Amino acid sequence: MSDPGVVDARGLRCPAPIILLARAARDAADGTVLEVWWTDPAAETDIGAWARMRGHQVLGTEPLAEPGEAPADGVPARATRVRLAR
């Protein structure tokens, strides 16, 4: 993870994206927005469930690639933003 606000879970299967998100959230301040990049379709549901269980807020999910840009491995990447609450 090069940007402290980005959790790059592209190419990983669940539950790995949630594990990485939880690790990043552990040291983040209240109100921090983390962006999770993922390719596993189950990640969207799992991120939402994780956020609800911990009182965080999912701000939205959108395509990660620019329109017309082909995904590197053939799987479209998405990004979900989560605002942390303590």
Give residue ranges: language-model regions:
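Domain-level signature for proteins that mediate thiol-based redox and metal-cofactor handling
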Residues: 1-86
